[in-house]
Amino acid sequence: MVNRSVKALQGQGFLTTDMELTEKARLEMAKHRPKNAVILAAGYGMRMVPINMETPKGLLEVEGEPLIERLIRQLHAVKVKEIYVVVGFKKEQYDYLVDRYGVKLVVNMEYAEKNNLHSLAKVLPQLGETYLMPCDLWCRENPFSEYEWYSWYLVSDAKDPDSTVRVSRKWELVPSGGEKEGNHMIGISYLTDPVAQSMARRIETMVQDRRYDHVFWEDALFAENGMPVQAKIVPEGAVVEINTYEQLRELDENSDQLKSDAMAEIERVLSVSGEEITGIEVLKKGMTNRSFLFRCRGGRYIMRIPGEGTSLLINRRQEAAVYRTLDGKGICDEIVSINPENGYKITKYLEGARVCDPENPEDVQACMKKLRSFHEEHLSVEHTFSLFDQIAYYESLWEGEPSVYRDYSTTKAHVLELGAYLEAQPKVWTLTHIDAVPDNFLFVEKNGGTEIRLIDWEYAGMQDAHVDLAMFCIYAMYDRPQVDALIDCYFTEGCPQEVRTKIYAYIAVCGLLWSNWCEYKSRLGVEFGEYSLRQYRYAKDYYQLVMQRLAKTEGQEE
């Protein structure tokens, strides 16, 4: 076999009889030198909680070395110096790489809403004879070479039921078809110019289609009309993907990133060591916070970590005071600890809990019964939640920038008109949740029955209890008939027309309040899609509705 190969190379003019490379061979090899590399580092790394609140995933350290620096050094070792790093989340922390390694940073500001296919779309002109990889890999040995003769994608010999590809008899990667376990996909690839250009054309089409907002770049590589790509197989464990806190701990228990503030808080509150904190799972990303589930000494808990900019939005001392008032009353979730300085909160996990379905009349009826029961406790705290003060405050956080809405000044003036009307209305002045939205009503099966617990009391304060009805409606994005149905669920005895009009006014005011809140969060890179638009529409539409009802009432009185 070897002799046959040698003779073939000599026959083609690549080897001399003295077994030395010919000039023709050197010219051919020069054509197959990798030109550049792309490292995808824009995403949140959501499963890396709690580390990702402080450090982007590419800068996680193993044995004192950031993951992305190890990849860059391995690329430099094979003489690949032209490196593009696509950044987004905490992009500023990657800037030092420009000075240290001469990399080029490419910014993808869509990282919060779209997957890494859209990051790759930012560097399509650079693709061709290119290494492509995510930033969160740790390679024991250098997976790169000075010469590459064909396109390949790196997989391990481990079988993975979630993988969409498997290695064929020709050592090509083909769809697993769902019938067989595929090979574990690692994410590193080498793309020759023909394969790269073919894939780039597909990506240009895919990014125009919202159906592909959440897909990985591999969907473009392995498309049905794509060129075949060879498999490059490494043993299981040769490349370690670090997607979770526990994976990092397994690889390097002394990593500095394991010493996060959130983990230190858990250790302090529960009097445990870090090794006793296991089963860490990210929960859904909230509108204000990020939370994760964990196990410790047989119990399950949730750690709440405040999100971007919340220190300007929420008074954590006031939140702690609310929880002290609620303690032992069976109204909220069971609080283990709340830190009034940084907002870290630990609660016991409610097994089997589900949130209210705002489209289910039985759920809504049960939630309104719970809400009214809470209001009728007539609890009190020392602070209030002023709707109009908060509207002005959220606007002040824009730091002089105009609203994104052209008619904001008119809309704001209309909403402020409602202030005098609301001031004159009778109120049920009590501790009010303020954020009594469907997602904050938890249904819990307990002792053969169902309990409802209200969670997330960050905004709670003294206010008219009927504000909570308005908040439920606008978060659920109810139309007018649904709003009226909810009001009727709360007022089982019947709702006086003047109270109904007052609630409509609260819908207008609260709509502008949360619209301003969304505008501030948008300036931090956090977007809420249709929700923000609907809040602004509530401000406009329900102002008009209130004005019509008041005019009709005045006409009847005359």
PLM region spans:
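Conserved alpha/beta core of the MobA/IspD/sugar-nucleotide pyrophosphorylase nucleotidyltransferase superfamily
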Residues: 3, 17-37, 184-268
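Conserved core of the sugar-phosphate nucleotidyltransferase
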Residues: 15, 140-216, 220
